[in-house]
């Protein structure tokens, strides 16, 4: 559960309504794979991830980034039940994929940076603070199965 004020909820919803999930998802996942190269081991089937340009131009990275942000959008619609919303994904990432739950926090922080880059002055300190709460809540929900 994420505790947001009505103003924070409105700010998150307003900005998220402008997000191009296809582009931002691919950029966020791509940046995660470039900045934290050890995360690439979970995506060996994606083909060439040998250079930043290869990662950022990889269609499988873009497609999976879109999928990730689609799930994130579902979370935004269920901020009062993030653990329930992400229960199956938490189980998948824990039991089958064996993803270090710290990677969820890293991706959330990368997403915040990508939003800041894409929205500039619209991404005010107040909007940033609200999104930090949201990505922290999503990361906690995704890590729930690990506990």
Swiss-Prot record:
Residues 3-147 form the Globin domain. Gene3D superfamilies: Globins. Red blood cells. Keywords: Heme, Iron, Metal-binding, Oxygen transport, Transport. Changing residue 70 to D: In allelic sequence. Pfam families: Globin (PF00042). The keyword Iron applies. Changing residue 7 to K: In allelic sequence. One of its GO terms (biological process) is hydrogen peroxide catabolic process. Heme b binds at residues 64, 93. GO terms for cellular component: blood microparticle; haptoglobin-hemoglobin complex; hemoglobin complex. GO terms for molecular function: haptoglobin binding; heme binding; hemoglobin alpha binding; metal ion binding; organic acid binding; oxygen binding; oxygen carrier activity; peroxidase activity. Heterotetramer of two delta chains and two alpha chains. Belongs to the globin family. This is Hemoglobin subunit delta. It comes from Ateles geoffroyi (Black-handed spider monkey). The gene is HBD.
